[in-house]
Amino acid sequence: MAARLVRRCTCLLREAARLAPAVSPVGQLRLPQGTQKPLTSSATSPSSRLPGLLSEFVEKEQVFTPYTGRQEVEQLIEKATQPEELLELLGSGHCLQQNHAALALIQLSRLLSEKPKDKAALIQDARFWQLLHLVNSQITVVWHGTLVKLLRSLYTLGLPATSKDLRSVEQEVRWRMRRLKYKHLAFLAESSATYMQEQGSRELLAELLVHLERRWAEIEDRRMVVAMMMKTGHLSESLMNRLEDKCLELVEQFGPEELRKVLVTLAAQNRRSVPLLRAISYHLVQKPFPLTKSILLDLAYAYGKLGFHQTQVFQRLAADLLPHTPSMTSSEVARCTKSFAFLKWLNLPLFEAFVQHVLDRAQSITLPHLCNMLLAFARVNFRPEREDPFFSLVHEKLGSELVGLEPALQVDVVWALCVLQQVREAELQAVLCPEFHTQFLGGKSPKDQSTFQKLLHINATAQLEHPEYTGPLLPTSALVPSPSALEQKMTPLQKELQETLKGLLGSADKGSFMVPTQYGWVLDAEVLLDTESQLLPLRDFVAPHLTPPSGSQPLPPGAKRLAFLRWEFPNFNSRSKDLLGRFMLARRHLLAAGFLLVDVPYYEWMELKSEWQKSAYLKDKMRKAVAEELAK
């Protein structure tokens, strides 16, 4: 504090010495009536104890002079259209006082905002540094609002991080931090946070974020809270929490544009703030304000990215987007389809409109957009009414360009065609050939393991659903599910299902649990029944679905192999009892492999309260599966 006081006194003495001849005629307030008398501080003020010229100058600072209009210098600065006009003010006889030099630098940064070459030339100009030194000498009397704009301008002008003048302005900002209004702090954070990180001013940035967090209750403007969430929220977890609280408080005042910005910001930072998302969803449903196409697309993206399900919002988004479909670009259609697929929300009229959009622009649509739509359709298991022309277009586009796609994307596309039952032999061969699939064998990353899991599904499709397919196939040694498929945490439904089945089986050799198959699917349980529906020991009989196949005895005539499959809530489309495409593919594969399926969906199991009810439910399911097979 002592060093700070000495610095300020030095600056005041220097200014007082320079302005001393002009003190007497300027420093009085002309009263409308009565004796004209300077209005100075009381005798007990600190300035009254300062000696000589410093005391006179401080008293001069405290004299109130009425504002009679814009000074000529300020007008010249504001009207300047070229940097040279501002630099010439130094030698043209104009007296640059208080904020003038700072305002000139701010205007310089505005004029050069899009001229990086001119910035480099400016920094080499001696007049620029003279102007900067003048600001530094007057830094203590620069107004708060001008000071924060000045710091932002110095960052944008590209001053070196070691510049003493830049550090001086930064230090002045730190000294005044407590006195700055919240809007000044917010402006500085929004406009200069990136520069502070790049310029090595991390201490100033950290202090700024602390003040913003502590004084968050001062935010009263919805524009300010939205802008801060977008520009600075990602820099501080605690600040973002406060901004979310303030946003929740002001959300009733938000218009569609503010709601869009908040949602996109949350999605970009992957922050699933449930109370805020619920409040935004409520206002989207209740308020009748119109939503433009771009806002609708951004809302769909944000909800999809965050995985936040709100049926009424999705219904409004789908209904409002449908009329915009003819005017949408292929990129927007692909993006929107992908967003709704992430949400597992299948709106048939909207998806059919997307298909029609693609067919109407068959010659111009690009393969990446078509691939995104194909993957989205496979996720929600959507089969369009005009599937023949649509998939003909897909195969036509893939014919020569499939091998040019990124390897993981090639697997995704062929897998999606398998889900939708539209894959062709050439596409199977493209990803099952040894030259291609070996790059994914033994992959340790989650992405590589996921891709190889899809290769197992593609291989199973070739074996089970395409009897005319002649190869190639994956090697037998590779037909092993990834460890992650068996290491997943046990769910309550899975645990209860296993406990109930163990009670029904009575003996451990009569059934198996968590059975990995060579098709890439894991069975929750497997049992073997003879013609009398009696349980048989599994280990005694051949099991071709395992890797490697086990057992030596062939199945008795009429024996049936049952697979139990539990279906959790995430396995279904939103607000539907229709399985997602991935799980429909699993059912098809296991049926083609000779299993009788016992489906155990969560919504049926939840209604069973006692162990007796659960046992009776499974027995009834097994009887129905056998009866359906016999009825064929």
From Swiss-Prot:
<comment type="function">
    <text>Plays a role in processing of mitochondrial RNA precursors and in stabilization of a subset of mature mitochondrial RNA species, such as MT-CO1, MT-CO2, MT-CYB, MT-CO3, MT-ND3, MT-ND5 and MT-ATP8/6. May play a role in cell cycle progression.</text>
</comment>
<feature type="domain" description="RAP">
    <location>
        <begin position="562"/>
        <end position="620"/>
    </location>
</feature>
<dbReference type="InterPro" id="IPR013584">
    <property type="entry name" value="RAP"/>
</dbReference>
<dbReference type="GO" id="GO:0016071">
    <property type="term" value="P:mRNA metabolic process"/>
</dbReference>
<protein>
    <recommendedName>
        <fullName>FAST kinase domain-containing protein 4</fullName>
    </recommendedName>
</protein>
<dbReference type="GO" id="GO:0005739">
    <property type="term" value="C:mitochondrion"/>
</dbReference>
<feature type="region of interest" description="Disordered">
    <location>
        <begin position="30"/>
        <end position="49"/>
    </location>
</feature>
<dbReference type="InterPro" id="IPR050870">
    <property type="entry name" value="FAST_kinase"/>
</dbReference>
<feature type="transit peptide" description="Mitochondrion">
    <location>
        <begin position="1"/>
        <end position="112"/>
    </location>
</feature>
<dbReference type="Pfam" id="PF06743">
    <property type="entry name" value="FAST_1"/>
</dbReference>
<dbReference type="Pfam" id="PF08373">
    <property type="entry name" value="RAP"/>
</dbReference>
<dbReference type="GO" id="GO:0003723">
    <property type="term" value="F:RNA binding"/>
</dbReference>
<dbReference type="GO" id="GO:0000963">
    <property type="term" value="P:mitochondrial RNA processing"/>
</dbReference>
<feature type="compositionally biased region" description="Polar residues">
    <location>
        <begin position="33"/>
        <end position="48"/>
    </location>
</feature>
<dbReference type="GO" id="GO:0090615">
    <property type="term" value="P:mitochondrial mRNA processing"/>
</dbReference>
<dbReference type="GO" id="GO:0005759">
    <property type="term" value="C:mitochondrial matrix"/>
</dbReference>
<comment type="similarity">
    <text>Belongs to the FAST kinase family.</text>
</comment>
<dbReference type="Pfam" id="PF08368">
    <property type="entry name" value="FAST_2"/>
</dbReference>
<keyword id="KW-0496">Mitochondrion</keyword>
<dbReference type="InterPro" id="IPR013579">
    <property type="entry name" value="FAST_2"/>
</dbReference>
<dbReference type="GO" id="GO:0035770">
    <property type="term" value="C:ribonucleoprotein granule"/>
</dbReference>
<dbReference type="InterPro" id="IPR010622">
    <property type="entry name" value="FAST_Leu-rich"/>
</dbReference>
<dbReference type="GO" id="GO:0044528">
    <property type="term" value="P:regulation of mitochondrial mRNA stability"/>
</dbReference>
<keyword id="KW-0809">Transit peptide</keyword>
